[in-house]
């Protein structure tokens, strides 16, 4: 009985506790990321944004949550009820599952696996199924068209993100997220992070992440002028909220990936005091919000692409460019003797 408790039950309880803590912190962070998105958009348009609920509007996201939960969910009469209700759950759960392997500080993750980057890529690839299920089960033309667009868009840009990951893998010599951060630890501080030597790759990752998460200017899935509200046309109340939550968790995941692969994760910008006095989780959070600020500014400033422009950019520009960068990075590492041992 003692062996059962020590070897199975106690580790299980620890993982459940860690998961609950991560989920709580992540959902609170997402609430303020959503508020930041609205505030940044308002600032660009010279508006105030949400400023009524709580001091400076800080409780606006929680008021929206309460409003959504208290509304009655509606299901179209011709919809496939089971798939219709399962779709937002699939989308949200898969987005949250990716955070199991993301380290917010040294040793601060639920699972430290050696193929963490591949795990995140695989889980984020599966999230398209939630959107396809929503589009098909709604039994409506606009959600179905949006779901088809989303499938094509996400598949197109996952290829570029895959080659970006290969470039980082070549430099770090590992697919372990902690090892990737440690590989960027040098006496040069932020100049030793991968954003500088791999800057073209960083730009490809940033734009591909925008397309992967259906963010403007690549929000063809939710193009209001063409598809009303995209695959979420028939959704209301809690299912709609789960879709929005899944979307913003996926955005936070991509921001965290950018922070880990190119901005040194939890490392301070300079390896000297007083920067080293600040906990690593604070640096990681600041970098995550910096990445999200870039996402939000793209939404506020750049007009939406046409669908043919989106596909052309993915297949005719980013795919050959990312493939060329893999060859260039591998060649430089090999011939300059910089390849990780």
Swiss-Prot record:
Enzyme class: translocase
Enzyme Commission numbers on file: 7.1.1.-
GO terms, molecular function: NADH dehydrogenase activity; oxidoreductase activity, acting on NAD(P)H, quinone or similar compound as acceptor; quinone binding
First and last residue of the signal peptide: none
PROSITE patterns: COMPLEX1_ND1_2
Record flagged with keyword ATP-binding: no
Major localization listed first in the record, in broad terms: membrane
Alphabetical keyword list: Cell inner membrane, Cell membrane, Membrane, NAD, Quinone, Translocase, Transmembrane, Transmembrane helix, Ubiquinone
GO CC, alphabetical: plasma membrane
Protein topology in the membrane: Multi-pass membrane protein
Location of this chain's protein in the cell: Cell inner membrane
Residues passing through the membrane, by range: 13-33, 82-102, 115-135, 161-181, 190-210, 242-262, 277-297, 317-337
Top-rank lineage group of the source organism: Bacteria
Pfam family for this entry, one: NADHdh
Protein's UniProt keywords contain Cell membrane: yes
Catalytic reactions on record: a quinone + NADH + 5 H(+)(in) = a quinol + NAD(+) + 4 H(+)(out)
Protein's GO biological process: aerobic respiration
Described purpose of this protein according to its UniProt entry: NDH-1 shuttles electrons from NADH, via FMN and iron-sulfur (Fe-S) centers, to quinones in the respiratory chain. The immediate electron acceptor for the enzyme in this species is believed to be ubiquinone. Couples the redox reaction to proton translocation (for every two electrons transferred, four hydrogen ions are translocated across the cytoplasmic membrane), and thus conserves the redox energy in a proton gradient. This subunit may bind ubiquinone.
Record's subunit section: NDH-1 is composed of 14 different subunits. Subunits NuoA, H, J, K, L, M, N constitute the membrane sector of the complex.
Family assignment from sequence similarity: Belongs to the complex I subunit 1 family.
Protein's UniProt name: NADH-quinone oxidoreductase subunit H 2
Gene: nuoH2
